[in-house]
Each structure stands twice: as C-alpha cells, then as structure tokens.
C-alpha cells in the first residue's frame, strides 16, 4: 500500500499517516522488505534507518540521531536546560501523590554511518580515519592524500559514494 512515511529518530522506528492523517507505526515491521520513498530505498533495520544506495557491491547509509533532553519549562514561559525539575508532588483527595515527569527528547543532529562490502566482509565507517582503516597501511597514505586533494566531506553521501566507487576500482 502507499502512505506518507517518516522515520522517528527518537523512538527509532518508521511511522506513517493513515487516511485520517493519524500517525501510526507498523505492527509487524519484519514483514516489510523494502520501503520506497521517491526514488530512494530503505530497509527496516534494527533500531536504525538504512538507505540502500547500491546493492552490489553493497553500499548502505545508516542514519541515527543525536538526541538530548528537551529544555524544561520554567516559570514565566521560559525554558532551561540546567534546572532539575524531574519530579512533582500534589495533594489529592486521599493524601499526597507524586511522580516523575516523562523525559521528552529532541533531535540535535543526524549521524551517517556507511556500510560497505569489502571482499566477503561487511565493514562500517563514518569519517576519514575509519575509512582509511579499510585498507592496508601501505594504501592508507595514498587514500589520505586523495581525500585531502578532493576535499571529501563525509557528511555528503554523494561524495562518499564516489570515493567508494574509486576505491573499489583501484
């Protein structure tokens, strides 16, 4: 079926909107092989969004979110990130009651981890240093120079994919 789909980086699962525009999540995500969003393909990963850039040789991008607690509300409509107001108490008809507020979280950034096939093994990298570890020490100097000369940004999927293509052709 077709529905607007999004990935919730905080709860780490895919959500979609039904015809009444209510947000829902998949009850059996393991039954879904691939999600097609426009011309992009995503796998239902274990607590992660996995985009398939190329099947053979494998090149996937794993998206994860940096999260932190949302700023807490304080008096006069302000917010604070340093106040420690995590519990509350109140008077009820039967006595004193208390509890802990739910921790609200916000996404502060998105991390990209690249998953590739190197020979028969699957390897992951996320920056220049971890990319260079895919190669023997003798080749690392050459690839380090290539990355510096071409100003490869490991936050750009397109640039990293081109770097991977060049590296497997040599």
Model-derived regions, located:
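Aromatic-patch recognition
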Residues: 1-123
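Long, compositionally biased interface segments
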Residues: 123-170
């Amino acid at each position: 079926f077709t529905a607007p789909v999004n990935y919730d980086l905080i709860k780490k699962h895919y959500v979609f909107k039904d015809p009444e525009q209510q947000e829902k999540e998949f009850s059996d995500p393991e039954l879904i092989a691939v999600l097609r969003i426009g011309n992009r393909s995503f796998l239902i990963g274990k607590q992660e969004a996995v985009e398939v850039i190329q099947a053979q040789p494998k090149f996937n991008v794993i998206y994860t979110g940096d999260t932190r607690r949302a700023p807490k509300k304080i008096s006069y409509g302000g917010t604070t990130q340093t106040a420690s107001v995590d519990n509350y108490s109140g008077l009820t008809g039967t006595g004193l009651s208390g509890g802990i507020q739910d921790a609200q979280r916000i996404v502060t950034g998105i991390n990209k981890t690249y998953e590739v096939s190197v020979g028969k093994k699957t390897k992951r990298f996320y920056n220049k240093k971890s990319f260079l570890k895919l190669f023997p020490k003798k080749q690392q100097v050459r690839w380090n120079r290539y990355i510096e000369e071409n100003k490869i940004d490991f936050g750009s999927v397109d640039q990293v994919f081109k770097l991977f293509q060049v590296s497997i052709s040599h």
